């Protein structure tokens, strides 16, 4: 907050307990997926995992070259991809998930400006090398948080809060509401919104550090008509590494949501307000979206 509003002393509000209903939905009964159905939905979407793995062979080989010692065993890259479910009911793709974690670790190291010697032992020296690995993250999103049933059970409560936040009479009554979420939360919400993006230097649907999913409420002062602008934005890999402040020479990378009836304007893509709210909220599971109070103290 000090970065956005230096010297203003803006307070940060948070839940008093250990679990936040908007972001830690695995802690609450209303937002818990049924394990059997979740397993079935993941298997249905996954299809032929061997074929999926083969399609990503180039990215897998690049990752192996980066993190494995030449001529030494690196068994994780020999594992078949399989759908697995833990005792807690969480479903994942063994083999893929560990590769995705490796890629995320390398991407975070790059973004945090770690010395190149600490990035896969000097094997990662250019942003383009990170870009080439990111399809593995996209694949992991596709088969986890982007599975529609999972997103609907766990993301409905957050999307509902976001849409309520841009309505007239919303609580809290503020001009700018920032919800600090994980990439997993954004992934589930964008799935329900039918909103995907591909920013330059990133794979489809990638959610970089510091990125944001933005909803803006606009009103035409002449006609009184209301509009909604929705977009996803992030900085480039190189700008993140340099801690580059966004400016005219280093603009934010941005992709806007649109549907029929939206119009391109000087301030961005504006969509008729009620039609946009209806479209963005049509997949919300109301039973998984109990009311959340965000009144300021």
Language-model segments: what does each one mean?
Residues 1-177, 183-297:
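Signature for phosphate-centric chemistry
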